């Protein structure tokens, strides 16, 4: 399947929203210059400690036809809103964060996204939300662009598996699931399993 990743930036009201927005723009610029714009969509909504913003962002990326999500911490993000976005989005999600570009502006230019990334991963676990986090999820715009591109085959596999239906060979009674196959992980991946019965046409 084709994958289109919606990139949503998040922020806190104790940090400049513009910092997160500008870092999102830098990420998108770095990505499109290296990989093109076909597989990504820049969501104009920046989530700033608001579940209203979260709903707006969710509706926007759905309307844009996105089937994968990237939550981008341009600075210290809001744990509740950003993780709820991943929860309510019907598709694979990843989390990455912006590194500090310089040490010269630690008042208006300090985002502390590294700390926000730690809190995000903790809150994802608390809510039992599955999301992809790269091994080194904090980086420059160029590094985050590479992470975003590396997420595409992962997202494609998840999207493809979510629509998969396995028809195995019987015959067995209708709706009969035995313990002779490791099917739990398939069910957790939202894969349906069916067996044709002796009564099937």
Regions found by a protein language model. Give the residues of each.
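Short beta-strand segments enriched in small/hydrophobic residues
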Residues: 1-21, 163-172
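Conserved anion/nucleotide-ligand pocket segment
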Residues: 7, 153-180, 184
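Glycine- and acidic-residue-enriched helix-capping/strand-helix junction motifs
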Residues: 12-27, 107-114, 174-180
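Short, solvent-exposed amphipathic alpha-helical segments in soluble enzyme
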Residues: 22-25, 85-88, 181-189
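Short beta-strand elements in bilobed, periplasmic/extracellular small-molecule ligand-binding domains
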Residues: 28-47, 130-136, 194
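Cofactor- and metal-binding active-site motifs of prokaryotic enzymes
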Residues: 47-162, 174
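Single conserved hydrophobic/aromatic residue that forms the stacking wall/gate
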Residues: 191-201
């Amino acid at each position: 399947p084709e994958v289109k990743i919606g990139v949503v930036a998040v922020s806190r009201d104790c940090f400049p929203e513009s910092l997160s927005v500008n870092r999102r723009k830098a990420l998108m610029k770095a990505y499109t210059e290296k990989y093109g714009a076909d597989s990504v969509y820049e969501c104009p909504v920046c989530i700033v400690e608001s579940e209203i913003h979260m709903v707006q962002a969710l509706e926007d990326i759905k309307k844009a036809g996105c089937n994968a999500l990237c939550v981008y911490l341009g600075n210290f993000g809001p744990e509740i809103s950003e993780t709820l976005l991943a929860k309510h989005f019907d598709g694979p999600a990843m989390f990455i964060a912006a590194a500090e570009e310089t040490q010269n502006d630690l008042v208006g230019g300090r985002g502390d996204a590294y700390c926000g990334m730690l809190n995000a991963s903790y809150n994802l676990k608390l809510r039992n939300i599955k999301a992809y986090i790269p091994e080194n999820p904090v980086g420059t715009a160029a590094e985050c662009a590479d992470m975003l591109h590396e997420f595409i085959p992962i997202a494609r596999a998840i999207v493809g598996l979510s629509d998969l239906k396995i028809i195995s060979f019987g015959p067995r009674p209708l709706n009969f699931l035995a313990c002779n196959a490791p099917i739990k992980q398939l069910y957790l991946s939202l894969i349906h399993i069916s067996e044709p019965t002796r009564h099937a046409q």
